[in-house]
């Protein structure tokens, strides 16, 4: 279930990098990432995407909120954050994914231990 967000994140990472590369600032509204103003996503497991301005040390960040129905109790309604920690230019960046709400057991291996 969480891996669906990981797969979806690639497109949103690209949008965020492009916006940051153009303006030097983070998007301020989710429509800048190509989703509607409510952040709604047509997905089996992911309910919405939002911007996250509180992740410590991040240049920019976005987060997925998981659906509450038909989900593992360890994931239902919880958030997974993707944070751009360093913009290296030329369309690339260093990323972290993490969650303070989802136990390590449920996180994809690339998100564990962060």
Language-model features, listed with the residues they occupy:
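Membrane-proximal N-terminal amphipathic helix
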Residues: 1-25
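Periplasmic/extracellular, small/polar-rich flexible segments of pilin-like filament-forming proteins
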Residues: 20-114
């Amino acid at each position: 279930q969480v891996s669906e967000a990981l797969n979806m994140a690639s497109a949103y990472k690209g949008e965020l990098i492009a916006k940051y590369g153009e303006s030097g600032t983070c998007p301020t509204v989710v429509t800048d990432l190509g989703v509607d103003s409510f952040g709604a996503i047509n997905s089996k497991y992911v309910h919405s995407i939002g911007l996250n301005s509180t992740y410590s040390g991040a240049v920019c960040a976005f987060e997925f909120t998981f659906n509450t129905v038909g989900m593992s109790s360890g994931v239902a309604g919880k958030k997974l954050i993707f944070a751009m920690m360093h913009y290296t230019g030329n369309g690339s960046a260093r990323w972290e994914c993490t969650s303070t709400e989802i136990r390590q057991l449920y996180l994809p291996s690339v998100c564990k231990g962060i």
